[in-house]
């Protein structure tokens, strides 16, 4: 799964862009994912994690 956070499972959101003339076009909003090296199950892995999980300390970064 390419655009899903490995920690919280956050993925894309779907909806409409609505113009001033009330025209609607479908759009997708993707989470802000970053590739980081993290300690998972005692080993270092490169995973995609959203910035909210990084900031809130749900991930232990590998040094």
Curated annotation (Swiss-Prot):
KW Ribonucleoprotein (keyword) present: yes
InterPro entries for this protein: Bacterial_rp_bL28, Ribosomal_bL28, Ribosomal_bL28/bL31-like_sf, Ribosomal_bL28_bact-type, Ribosomal_bL28_sf
Signal peptide (from-to): none
Domain of life of the source: Bacteria
Keywords linked to the UniProt accession: Ribonucleoprotein, Ribosomal protein
UniProt xrefs under Pfam families: Ribosomal_L28
Entry's Gene Ontology BP terms: translation
Classification via SUPFAM superfamilies: L28p-like
GO molecular function: structural constituent of ribosome
Cellular-component GO terms for this entry: ribonucleoprotein complex; ribosome
PANTHER family: 50S RIBOSOMAL PROTEIN L28, LARGE RIBOSOMAL SUBUNIT PROTEIN BL28A
Family: Belongs to the bacterial ribosomal protein bL28 family.
Name by which UniProt lists this protein: Large ribosomal subunit protein bL28
Annotated organism of origin: Pelobacter propionicus (strain DSM 2379 / NBRC 103807 / OttBd1)
Gene that this polypeptide is encoded by: rpmB
